[in-house]
Structures are given as structure tokens and as C-alpha cells.
Amino acid sequence: MIRYIFIFFLTLIAISSVECNAQIASPNKVVSHKPVIITGADQTEKYLPYLKGKRIGLVANQSSIIGTVSSVDSLSSLGINIVKVFGPEHGFRGNASNGAVVNNETDAKTGIPIISLYGKNQKPTKEQLADIDLIVFDIQDVGCRYYTNINTLEYVMEACAENGKQLLILDRPNPNAYVVDGPVMTDDKFKSAIGIHYTPMTHGMTIGEFAQYLNGEGYLKNPCKIKIIKVANYNHDMPYVLPVNPSPNLNTQQAVMLFPSLCMFEGTAINEGRGTYTPFTILGAPALKGKYAFSYKPVSIPGMSERPNHKDSVCYGLDLSTYAIDRLVKSRQISLSWLIELYNAYPDKANFFTPGRADQDISAFDLRIGTDQLRKQIIAGVSEADIRKSWEPGLQKFKAIRMKYLLYP
């Protein structure tokens, strides 16, 4: 209890310090006392009593922090009995490359078993949950259908429902919550490891809201019993700079904000910066030599991208590392212009979109987008305005559904 009170007062002191520093920096200006966003995890007073005396399973990675300290370390130091940690794609420490199989291990620092949900099984098994009373989910998401943390959330909820376990969600802001955009996946044939939900490409929900959506829209055979610790002082239009990189290739705020637009290129002949230390801020391909002055060379980077597209070849294209993100925020849209531009500039258009399921005429791009319509529209030269118009019926229907599950304005 003493340690809990100590941490609580440290949090108050930190918040006061931020406000005090603002006053010192601008002594002659009117200081705006905007409420400070406080994540669910940082509101320990709201959930510590609920964890006491229970055997806890924690779904976590490097973004799971209380203050600046790992949630595993913090909760353990506060006397919480964490018996198991479940890690998503990229692993518990967040140092595995995209798509890489992650094995079970024991955390060297705490001795706690770490179960990979991106290895032999994506869903916790009955045996893995047998010695757990409560599951806690605390992972930062970035608001895209093709970012696999929401897949992990569904699998964990399904396992909890099947095994009579409750799920406590420590909610975090969605840095891309301002945008609900892109085509809505409506056909099962486009389901894959990077998309299993009938949402637009960007859904505009936090993890807590998405959990309510999964329960309410019948994604689970039986609803999961959930308890959500909401983010304090937050709404969907508020900017949020992530305190920790959510995955190895989202290593800057610029990359996080560009991710919804640039991740589309993973299903094309264009390299989106993987194999560099500025992923998701640059675009290019060797075939664009002579059409763009900007160039870079993707290489193998352990823990980020071992086999990037166009490895060891000079790529030419676009440098978006200084692109004004405010333009995307104000438009409340993902960008289509870069996709259209680079397709039109690419000399070998027949090989711009990379293969996926050839027997079904589904490209890797289609699996990421959730439909084959966009690919066919790009090839046919349909204008951006008409492409966006074709998305509207699905978007309007989804937005009406989404409204039922929002926890924040």
C-alpha cells in the first residue's frame, strides 16, 4: 500500500512539474491548462485493488508501461502476482521483425514465463490459462486493420470467453483515431493474417472500444466478459505522441502517422522504407531510377527487416520524412495520391501489384486492403475522387455501427 501511495504521488508531482515548466517557459503568456491525457495503465488506483490476490496473465509488449517502467516490472514490484506474460507479433520485448515467428521463453529479468501468441498458437490455450484468474490486456495500437494487435485482441477475448476468464483492458489512445477511411472488407475470401475484421482500413477506435465492437458485432461465439480502464481526459481528435515505439518499424511519430497510408505499398513492387532506419517515411523502387532524384538502399537489419523488398538495391522515389502530417489530420483521410502517383510512374505496371493467392486472382495488395476493387480501380485509371466516392456507402454504414461502441467523444 505504501508503494502504491508513493507511485500515486509521484504521478501527481510529474503532472504538476509539466504545468510548472510551461509557466516558467512563457512567463508573460496566458498558460492553457489543458487536461493531461492519462492512459488506463497509469491510473493504478482504479485497478490495483482488483488485481490483488489474483493470478494474473498479462498480454503485453514493450509499449506496456506504467509511467516509464514496464508494466510487468511495475506490477510485480507492487505485489501483483503475474504468473504469465503473453506476447504479440514482434514479441514481448518488441525486437522481432514483422511476420517473424516468436518462440516461448522465460523473461531473464523476472523469471516469468512468456508465451508467444505469434508462434505455435495465436490464441491462448486452455492449458496456458489453467493457472490464471484474470487476463490483463495492455498493448498500444495504431488504429489500422492490418496492424495485428487487434487480431491478438480477438483471439485473447475468444480464449477468455471459452475458458470462463475475465479480461481487464488498460486502454490507450489511438494516434490515428482522427481518421475512419478506406474500403470496408466485406468478403471472407480477403481474410488473412493481416486482416480478419469487417472494418475500413483505419477504424478510429481504441483497443477498449474495439473490444466492445468485437463483443457487440458477434465476432465471438460467446461474448467475453471485459472491464475497461478508460483513458482520462481524452477524445478522438486529440493528438497523441506515443511514448514508446509500438513496433520495430514504427520507430518515429512520423512513421506512426504515415503508416495507414504507406503500409498499402507492402502489397506492391514499392519498398516502403523497410530495410532502412526510417521505415514508413520513404517510398521507392529500383525501376523508378531517372524519374525521382531521391534514393536509398534497403539492407538487412536484424530485429527490423531481415529480407526487405529490393534488398541491397538502390531505390528511387519519395522522401516523406518531413511531410506535414497536419495535412492528413485536417483531411481526416489516408493518402491515395502517393499510390496513384507511383503506379503511374512505374514502368512495369503488370508487376506493380505483387502476387497473393493466384488461384483466386487475389493479390497481396488485395489482402492488405481487404478488397480487390481498389487494385482494379488503380489499374483502370479511376480518379481519386471517384475511388473515394465508391468507399462512402461502406464507410457510412461502418461509422453508424462504430458509434455504438465509442467510449470517448
Q: What feature does the model see in each segment?
A:
Residues 190-262:
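Conserved anion/nucleotide-ligand pocket segment
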Residues 94-99, 168-190:
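Glycine-rich, charge-decorated loop segments at or immediately adjacent to ligand/cofactor-binding or catalytic sites
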